[in-house]
Structures are given as C-alpha cells and as structure tokens.
C-alpha cells in the first residue's frame, strides 16, 4: 500500500524535513510513503477562490486515479490514535493508494474537501504546515505500530 501525502507548500524547515524523514524510514516496506509538495499559489491581487482553485488543480494533478482521498480539514472527523490505526487498517483493505491532502495557508478548496472520500483533523489547534507534515507521518507510524505489536505506542 502507498501512503501519498500531497501538501501545498514547497519550503519546509530542515528540522521538519529531518523529522519527516526519520518517521518515514521507520515505516515497513509494505507501507510506502511518498510526499508530494505542490506550489502555493502567489496571492498577487487574486481572490481567495481563485487561489484555492489553482492549488486544487495542482493537488488533483498529484493524486493518482483510483486513490482513496483523505482531506485533512479542521472541520473533519476527530480521531484518536486507536481510531486512526483502525482507519489505516481499513485503507489497507480498500486499495493501493491513500492520498492524504494537506492544504496551504488558506486551507483546501471547498470542492476538493467535498470530493474527498473522508475528512479528518489532526488537532483542534491550528498548526504550522511543517508541523502538520511531521505530526501526520508520526501518527501514521504510530498507527502502524499499534497493529504490528511494536512497542512504540504505550497505553
């Protein structure tokens, strides 16, 4: 199974990239992780709707046909770590690729959010985008570790 994170924004601080790489390499070979960063649309006098639509086009171009699409959204379903572990298990049964979408500074285009198979939130807090990437990959690793019986997660 492939976990594809499609994130708006190409600049990530070194500390965040290091953390993402660390958790990604801990995942087993059967859970391939790929991060595709797409360009943030420059504001330059554009409306919010046109900015989000441009980013939506880039995100959609990065999602393979047939992928299960999960949008990270502040209004999405609140999950516990155990619930995310169950979701991960379910995604593994559904198909080859799960695309997890991380919006830019203005979030995701409403049409993209609506078209997603599922919407989840990582936190009730507003988080910096670099931290969202780290947190998401860490939580995916933690979810895998629960089902694998790995001692990483403690109750």
Curated annotation (Swiss-Prot):
Pfam families according to UniProt: SPOUT_MTase (PF02590)
Subcellular location: Cytoplasm
The reaction(s) this protein catalyses: pseudouridine(1915) in 23S rRNA + S-adenosyl-L-methionine = N(3)-methylpseudouridine(1915) in 23S rRNA + S-adenosyl-L-homocysteine + H(+)
Domain of life of the native organism: Bacteria
Enzyme Commission number, as recorded: 2.1.1.177
Family annotation (HAMAP family): 23SrRNA_methyltr_H
Family the entry assigns: Belongs to the RNA methyltransferase RlmH family.
Function: Specifically methylates the pseudouridine at position 1915 (m3Psi1915) in 23S rRNA.
Protein name: Ribosomal RNA large subunit methyltransferase H
The species this protein was found in: Verminephrobacter eiseniae (strain EF01-2)
Gene name tied to this protein: rlmH
